[in-house]
């Protein structure tokens, strides 16, 4: 249902900044807690709204530099706060997990009344978006920004030590049915990846099938939590004619911060995503 955001609630957002157009807020009641989502609506709609699944430690304002630009270009979006990731989502579900986040996302996407054709997943949110897409037959486009993929067994583990242990096992990320989903997905996929994310782990002193982690390269600290093999496995799973990839130079896994710090890159990413969404081929 639509509801009015209070000053106290705004104070819990990561970024309280004015939207370039209309915004509406939706609240859903779950088992013992509530979560909110924000719908950005363009003045002139050129495409159905995206459903956006944010990354770890994100609320629905984290991707403002991208989502506001898309709103100006006629593409709206609905983004929900998911349990376990931000001050704005607290208290949230007890024992929050990817599976609980998926349930929350499923509830919120229903507010788009089946109009949504594109899912956008950021980092951890990409793992959830892939699971969500498998349940929504109308989805024909996926935008995956610095995507993470986790073993299926990790999806029910509560965030914390158990979840971390499950995802840090070498090669565990291959134990996921999202690759099989992509192999039969008839739609198109856009990957947006930082140049210094998905670094080769062996080249940086780590074991195969793991991430390179944080590395200092040419005097600059670079964060690469995504194993190189995850990106390769995703690209292998999507038929070549259906896959596009935008590589952001001088950028690591922190794409959300990079878009905020470098407006011209935010322009580039927004233009690429808008072109992808609006392309009817």
Please name every model-derived segment.
Residues 94-112:
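Alpha/beta-hydrolase active-site loop
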Residues 56-68, 203-204:
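The serine-hydrolase catalytic nucleophile loop
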Residues 185, 191-193:
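Short beta-strand/loop motif that positions the catalytic acidic residue
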Residues 2-42:
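N-terminal cap/lid segment of alpha/beta-hydrolase-fold proteins
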Residues 71-89:
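Conserved alpha/beta-hydrolase
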């Amino acid at each position: 249902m639509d509801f009015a955001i209070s000053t106290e609630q705004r104070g819990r957002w990561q970024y309280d900044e004015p939207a370039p157009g209309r915004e509406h807020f939706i609240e859903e009641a779950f088992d013992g807690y509530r979560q909110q989502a924000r719908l950005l609506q363009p003045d002139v709609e050129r495409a159905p709204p995206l459903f956006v699944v944010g990354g770890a430690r994100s609320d629905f304002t984290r991707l403002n530099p991208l989502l506001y630009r898309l709103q100006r270009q006629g593409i709206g979006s609905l983004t929900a706060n998911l349990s376990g990731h931000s001050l704005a989502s607290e208290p949230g579900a007890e024992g929050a997990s990817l599976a609980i986040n998926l349930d929350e996302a499923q509830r919120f996407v229903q507010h788009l009344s089946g109009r949504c054709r594109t899912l956008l997943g950021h980092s951890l949110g990409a793992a959830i978006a892939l699971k969500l897409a498998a349940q929504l037959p109308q989805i024909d486009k996926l935008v995956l920004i610095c995507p993470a993929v986790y073993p299926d067994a990790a999806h029910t583990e509560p965030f914390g030590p158990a979840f971390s242990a499950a995802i840090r096992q070498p090669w565990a990320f291959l134990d996921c049915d999202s690759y099989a989903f992509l192999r039969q997905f008839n739609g198109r996929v856009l990957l947006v990846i930082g140049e210094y994310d998905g670094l080769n782990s062996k080249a940086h002193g780590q074991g195969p099938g793991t991430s390179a982690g944080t590395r200092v390269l040419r005097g600059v600290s670079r964060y690469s939590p995504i194993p190189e093999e995850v990106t390769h496995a995703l690209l292998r799973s999507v038929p070549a004619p259906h896959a596009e990839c935008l590589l952001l130079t001088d950028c690591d896994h922190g794409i959300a911060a990079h878009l905020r710090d470098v407006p011209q890159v935010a322009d580039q990413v927004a233009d690429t995503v808008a072109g992808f969404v609006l392309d009817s081929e």
